[in-house]
Amino acid sequence: MRECISVHVGQAGVQIGNACWELYCLEHGIQPDGQMPSDKTIGTGDDSFNTFFSETGSGKHVPRAVYVDLEPTVVDEVRTGTYRQLFHPEQLITGKEDAANNYARGHYTIGKEIVDLVLDRIRKLADQCTGLQGFLIFHSFGGGTGSGFTSLLMERLSVDYGKKSKLEFAVYPAPQVSTAVVEPYNSILTTHTTLEHSDCAFMVDNEAIYDICRRNLDIERPTYTNLNRLIGQIVSSITASLRFDGALNVDLTEFQTNLVPYPRIHFPLVTYAPVISSEKAYHEQLTVSEITNTCFEPANQMVKCDPRHGKYMACCLLYRGDVVPKDVNAAIAAIKTKRSIQFVDWCPTGFKVGINYQPPTVVPGGDLAKVQRAVCMLSNTTAIAEAWARLDHKFDLMYAKRAFVHWYVGEGMEEGEFSEAREDLAALEKDYEEVGLDSTEADDTAGEEF
């Protein structure tokens, strides 16, 4: 079996986790108490969904997941909520005091007290696996736990499970709306620390998803539940090929192989289609080519940046539902003829396709319409460098005045870590710039250095 362990860190990670596991349970017909009426082979775990759920002798299905937060309130909602019986109590780990939006608290002072406990729980889950494939880590860049504790955990996971893949789903600080003043600090510190430990990081920013909810679903004031359910659909699409048998299946390492041309350039952009409300879906056909085209519109991306300003290095299209390869090939051919989409000249083909016959499931009473087919596009484009540039700029404005730095230093960090992290991100921006150059231009610049 190729199992995956999900780790949900901090408030954002836990709440996205709730949306994801709610959706997985609906997709597999697992009840909130973990029973699965359709599963006839009790206790033997040879079905595809066993990559995400382990089975007990009594036929209960338990998510292979750990929830971690340094303060209890958010995880307490899981402990008392609808799915309280789904999780093993040991899988829900909470500390006593908050990381207070402070990377240093999450990474040094408070994080280090709880990290061994978390690794112990992860070890127990890993021991139940026959062939652990890797980890999916859900967190935000802006919070203290999400940034600080995640980077600590990633470092330790690299030590304990060296070769296993680690994929991140990270909530990137939105350009306009912000939940904390120090988000740029936390984001840049965590990106620097996890850059070498993460194999692939899918970023979503709240503002982009707000806009999608407002525009496509006509929700005037989207709540976090609305946002997370949409993120849940995306995560479900990415992991569907791990949980169902399909025509063209994709496993964790395959994402990396096809999306990451260089180890540091591992931040694909995520787009999902169709995001549509039930009233509208009733009147629309949504063919394969329509939903494929929708993916290439900047308005449907999960991070605010404009791929028309950048070049695509690789592109992964994950279809689910009533889709046949013939339609997909036609849709891709049509896109290639449109000259609006530019690929780097050293990667001419650049499309990987996954098809899964399990149609998308939606949460009953939710905002999304039930559709016959959906597509999730993961594209590695140089345009995402815009997102880093924005963040770096905000970091510079604050750091020039050393604003808020004393909170971090007071928790045992050194000021040098800030400048080191900032230099690393400057290098990352440069890497993106160089990757986007045509191979002939790149050779010229290399020649000038010597």
Swiss-Prot record:
Tell me how the protein is altered or processed after translation: Undergoes a tyrosination/detyrosination cycle, the cyclic removal and re-addition of a C-terminal tyrosine residue by the enzymes tubulin tyrosine carboxypeptidase (TTCP) and tubulin tyrosine ligase (TTL), respectively.
Q: Which Pfam families did the record assign?
A: Tubulin, Tubulin_C
Residues noted as binding GTP in the record, renumbered to the chain? Q11, E71, S140, G144, T145, T179, N206, N228
- Compartments, record wording: Cytoplasm, Cytoskeleton
Annotated positions of the N6-acetyllysine modification: K40
InterPro entries xrefs: Alpha_tubulin, Tub_FtsZ_C, Tubulin, Tubulin/FtsZ-like_C, Tubulin/FtsZ_2-layer-sand-dom, Tubulin/FtsZ_GTPase_sf, Tubulin_C, Tubulin_CS
**Keyword Cytoplasm attributed:** yes
Q: What is the E.C. number?
A: 3.6.5.-
Q: What class of enzyme is it?
A: hydrolase
**Cofactor names:** Mg(2+)
Query: Its GO biological process terms?
Result: microtubule-based process
Q: Which Gene3D superfamilies does the entry link to?
A: Helix hairpin bin, Tubulin/FtsZ, C-terminal domain, Tubulin/FtsZ, GTPase domain
UniProt entry tagged with the keyword NAD: no
Question: What SUPFAM superfamilies does the record tag this protein with?
Answer: Tubulin C-terminal domain-like, Tubulin nucleotide-binding domain-like
SMART domains in the record: Tubulin, Tubulin_C
- Molecular function as annotated in GO: GTP binding; hydrolase activity; metal ion binding; structural constituent of cytoskeleton
Q: Which residues bind Mg(2+)?
A: E71
Q: Alphabetically list the UniProt keywords.
A: Acetylation, Allergen, Cytoplasm, Cytoskeleton, GTP-binding, Hydrolase, Magnesium, Metal-binding, Microtubule, Nucleotide-binding
Q: A single GO CC term, please?
A: microtubule
What residues make up the catalytic site? E254
Give the protein's function.
Tubulin is the major constituent of microtubules, a cylinder consisting of laterally associated linear protofilaments composed of alpha- and beta-tubulin heterodimers. Microtubules grow by the addition of GTP-tubulin dimers to the microtubule end, where a stabilizing cap forms. Below the cap, tubulin dimers are in GDP-bound state, owing to GTPase activity of alpha-tubulin.
Protein family membership: Belongs to the tubulin family.
Among PANTHER family, the record links this protein to: TUBULIN
Q: What does the record note on quaternary structure? A: Dimer of alpha and beta chains. A typical microtubule is a hollow water-filled tube with an outer diameter of 25 nm and an inner diameter of 15 nM. Alpha-beta heterodimers associate head-to-tail to form protofilaments running lengthwise along the microtubule wall with the beta-tubulin subunit facing the microtubule plus end conferring a structural polarity. Microtubules usually have 13 protofilaments but different protofilament numbers can be found in some organisms and specialized cells.
Under what name is this protein listed? Answer: Tubulin alpha chain
The organism is: Lepidoglyphus destructor
